[in-house]
């Protein structure tokens, strides 16, 4: 005699089916919420030039046309939002064009922001007194390193800022921030 029974496929009760559907609904809703929160906290990719460059922006995040900066007097240092939103000085040269080197406004001593002093023709950090020459090299410490620089290019009245990849023109060596 054979005492084996055929195994019947499991049948879901109404309660199990409703629990499964409710759990699936909660999981889908939570996933959609997590995706939306992730998109909120991750900044959108910047669209810009080649080499990881971005368009220079004002404090409100609006692109700044090159003509606006170039309307300033020669020697002017205009502060814009550059790479990663870092404040960056753009320099109007004596011939009325924009310098291809921008200077990031972050002291190499402790990261303070600093103004350009037109009377003394140098950047002066108010936190601990570091001073920098117009090209961003250290004039007086305690800052140990020259200021970070970026590449600046003008294309169709748009200012593109991209990371500095060449040798530092002030030292002739590989930049310390690369």
Swiss-Prot record:
It is an enzyme of class 7 (translocase). It comes from the Bacteria. Its cofactor is [2Fe-2S] cluster. The chain crosses the membrane at residues 17-36. GO terms for molecular function: 2 iron, 2 sulfur cluster binding; electron transporter, transferring electrons within cytochrome b6/f complex of photosystem II activity; metal ion binding; monooxygenase activity; oxidoreductase activity; oxidoreductase activity, acting on paired donors, with incorporation or reduction of molecular oxygen; plastoquinol--plastocyanin reductase activity. [2Fe-2S] cluster binds at residues 107, 109, 125, 128. It is a single-pass membrane protein. Keywords: 2Fe-2S, Disulfide bond, Electron transport, Iron, Iron-sulfur, Membrane, Metal-binding, Thylakoid, Translocase, Transmembrane, Transmembrane helix, Transport. Disulfide bonds join 112-127. It catalyses: 2 oxidized [plastocyanin] + a plastoquinol + 2 H(+)(in) = 2 reduced [plastocyanin] + a plastoquinone + 4 H(+)(out). GO terms for biological process: photosynthesis. Residues 61-161 form the Rieske domain. The 4 large subunits of the cytochrome b6-f complex are cytochrome b6, subunit IV (17 kDa polypeptide, PetD), cytochrome f and the Rieske protein, while the 4 small subunits are PetG, PetL, PetM and PetN. The complex functions as a dimer. This is Cytochrome b6-f complex iron-sulfur subunit 1. It comes from Synechocystis sp. (strain ATCC 27184 / PCC 6803 / Kazusa).
């Amino acid at each position: 005699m054979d005492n084996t029974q055929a195994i019947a496929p499991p049948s879901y009760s109404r309660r199990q089916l409703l629990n499964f559907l409710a759990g699936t609904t909660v999981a889908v809703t939570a996933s959609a919420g997590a995706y939306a929160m992730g998109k909120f906290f991750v900044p959108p990719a910047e669209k810009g030039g080649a080499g990881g460059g971005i368009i220079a922006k004002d404090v409100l995040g609006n692109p700044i046309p090159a003509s606006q900066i170039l309307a300033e007097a020669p020697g002017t240092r205009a502060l814009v939002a550059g790479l990663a939103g870092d404040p960056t000085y753009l320099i109007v040269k004596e011939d009325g064009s924009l310098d291809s080197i921008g200077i990031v406004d972050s002291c190499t001593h402790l990261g303070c922001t600093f103004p350009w002093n037109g009377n003394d023709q140098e950047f002066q950090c108010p936190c601990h007194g570091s001073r920098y020459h117009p090209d961003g090299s250290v004039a007086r410490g305690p800052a140990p390193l020259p200021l970070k620089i970026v590449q600046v290019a003008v294309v169709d009245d748009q200012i593109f800022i991209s990371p500095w990849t060449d040798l530092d023109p002030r030292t002739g060596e590989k930049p310390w921030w690369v």
